[in-house]
Amino acid sequence: GKLKKATNYKVVDTNPAASKYSYVPGNNQILSANCGSLPPLTYTNVTYGGVLEVDDDSEGPIALPFTFCFYGTNYTDVYINSNGNITFGAGQTSFSSTGFPNGTDQMIAPFWADFDNGGGNGVAKISMGTDYMVVTWDSVGYFNEQGDKRNTCTVVITDGLSPILPVGNNVG
């Protein structure tokens, strides 16, 4: 697959009449964004150098079963990073996010934050088919093994034709 040459993507609420979301920073609110659903998948936990619970680490390169074109460059492998992103060409262990594009990271970041899944605070997991790769950071805590605020985020990349995504959601 290939990402469209756009810099802004937006989440479209499929039921705006039922939406009553308002966010006030620091209010300890729990928010949810549902951008579609995937079929049932079989996942494998990601280990970083054989270790499941890590802070600021990267695993890879992991071979993709297809060629993925990202901003005009073809990639056949990916790095899964513990802080909520995947990168191409090299791993990324920085816990502090930077602006995009920054010129050095070929990255897709569904939620780049200082995740720390130590102490049983969630896990990164992967599912791969012949035409897709799904990475989910599932119920991960934040820095210093904190478990009171957790995030789950997912990134899906495909060959551009995969039926794993609903019709119209593959870009190419």
Where are the predicted features?
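Von Willebrand factor type D
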Residues: 1-172
